[in-house]
């Protein structure tokens, strides 16, 4: 019985990180109507900002440098109780297509976005984070996919960079590349199950009023799928996302984002029924729910392995236990050296893997004990 539990736990972890990717790799692409690339309706760009005085002007400059027709752009900045001068910078920006909405008192990102949507004039909404940098072609590349009436949402290709804008080979970046590959294959086969909150476009009809503790980039794609429309990943709509410079802050961010994802999936839990939603439900289980359950699989594998090795330490179970202990020992070394760029790649990957799953455990604890978080901290890359 213990052996069965061990192998179930191990296979669940392996399926989550490798098996699902293999399934996507083997599946055929779904047919898609041809698009002309000439689709350029007016769009409303919504930027939720909290304490963004150091970056808001650069964000507006970058957004308005787009190749998209300026006359078809509306930029709405919603400040969430910022007291650092962000409001004043937006007011003085001096472009007629830029407007400011103040949210006082502070109520969180989702509440700010809802205020922005309520003020938006156009039927195509674009959400982008304050510190995300776009290429000049990113907005037109994103929007052109909505020429296909079966598409409800289009998400970007995220590229994580250092604060100076240069690329890096960190464990976090490797994970993001893996995530972008999964989304690209999901998009070719069916539909992505979550969007890049840094930069995505959605039809206004799918932006439903949601509780402030939910996060938009998970619940909105679920809403689109619920209505029978597709969500795409578009690799040519690139967004450059500055890495969080602190490993501790990255841990907190991952826990917060996972808590939001769990809440969103529980809010739309009917989509987990494969009898009603078919392969999309399989995607949700494989890409989201199983991944969030991995820490429990790791714990089960460790506990059952410890029991099994106590009966026969020189067998396969002894080797398996050494492998597991080696992973966690490497993670401890990675934790001690988490701010040292010279740390070996395998050590960094071990630390990232273990710390990510500890963040998932924290998310489940928060979900069970409180379940809700509405506010967010300063922008990525800010002190």
Located regions from the model:
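Short aromatic/hydrophobic "clamp" motif used to bind/position activated sugar donors
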Residues: 125
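Glycine-rich, basic loop-to-helix element that forms the pyrophosphate-binding segment
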Residues: 103-120, 140, 177, 219
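Long helical/loop segments within the catalytic core of UDP-sugar-dependent glycosyltransferases
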Residues: 110-112, 136-214, 352
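N-terminal membrane-anchoring/stem segments of glycan-assembly enzymes
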Residues: 1-37
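Short, acidic, metal-binding catalytic loop of nucleotide-sugar glycosyltransferases
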Residues: 61-72
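Catalytic donor/gating beta->alpha subdomain of glycosyltransferases that bind UDP-sugars
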Residues: 95, 146-179, 212, 216-287, ...
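A conserved acidic beta->alpha catalytic loop
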Residues: 79-88, 105, 132
């Amino acid at each position: 019985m213990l052996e069965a539990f061990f192998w179930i736990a191990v296979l669940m972890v392996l399926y989550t990180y490798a098996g699902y990717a293999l399934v996507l790799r083997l599946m055929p692409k779904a047919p898609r109507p041809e698009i002309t690339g000439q689709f350029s309706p007016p769009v409303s760009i919504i930027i939720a900002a909290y304490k963004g005085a150091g970056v808001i002007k650069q964000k507006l400059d970058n957004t308005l440098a787009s190749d998209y027709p300026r006359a078809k752009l509306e930029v709405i900045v919603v400040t969430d109780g910022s007291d650092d001068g962000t409001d004043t910078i937006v007011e003085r920006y001096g472009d007629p297509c830029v407007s400011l909405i103040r949210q006082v008192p502070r109520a969180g990102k989702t509440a700010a976005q809802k205020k922005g949507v309520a003020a938006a004039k156009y039927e195509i909404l674009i959400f982008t984070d304050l510190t995300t940098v776009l290429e000049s072609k990113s907005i037109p590349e994103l929007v052109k996919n909505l020429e296909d009436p079966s598409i409800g949402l289009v998400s970007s290709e995220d590229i994580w960079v250092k604060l100076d804008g240069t690329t890096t080979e960190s464990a976090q970046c490797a994970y993001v590349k893996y995530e972008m590959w999964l989304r690209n294959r999901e998009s070719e086969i069916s539909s992505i199950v979550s969007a890049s909150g840094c930069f995505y476009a959605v039809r206004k009809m799918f932006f439903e009023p949601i509780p402030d503790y939910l996060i938009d980039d998970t619940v909105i794609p679920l809403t689109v799928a619920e209505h029978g429309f597709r969500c795409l990943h578009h690799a040519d709509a690139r967004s450059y996302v500055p890495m969080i410079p602190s490993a501790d802050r990255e841990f907190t961010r991952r826990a917060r984002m996972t808590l939001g994802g769990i809440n969103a999936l529980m809010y739309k839990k009917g989509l987990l029924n494969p009898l009603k939603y078919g392969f999309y439900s399989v995607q949700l289980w494989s890409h989201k729910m199983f991944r969030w359950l991995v820490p429990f699989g790791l714990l089960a594998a460790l506990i059952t392995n410890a029991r099994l090795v106590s009966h026969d330490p020189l067998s396969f179970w002894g080797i398996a236990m050494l492998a597991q202990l080696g992973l966690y020992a490497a993670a401890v070394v990675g934790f001690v050296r988490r701010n040292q760029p010279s740390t070996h790649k395998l050590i960094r990957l071990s630390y990232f893997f273990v710390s990510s799953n500890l963040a998932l455990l924290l998310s489940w604890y928060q979900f069970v004990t409180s379940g809700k978080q509405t506010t967010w901290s300063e922008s990525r890359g800010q002190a």
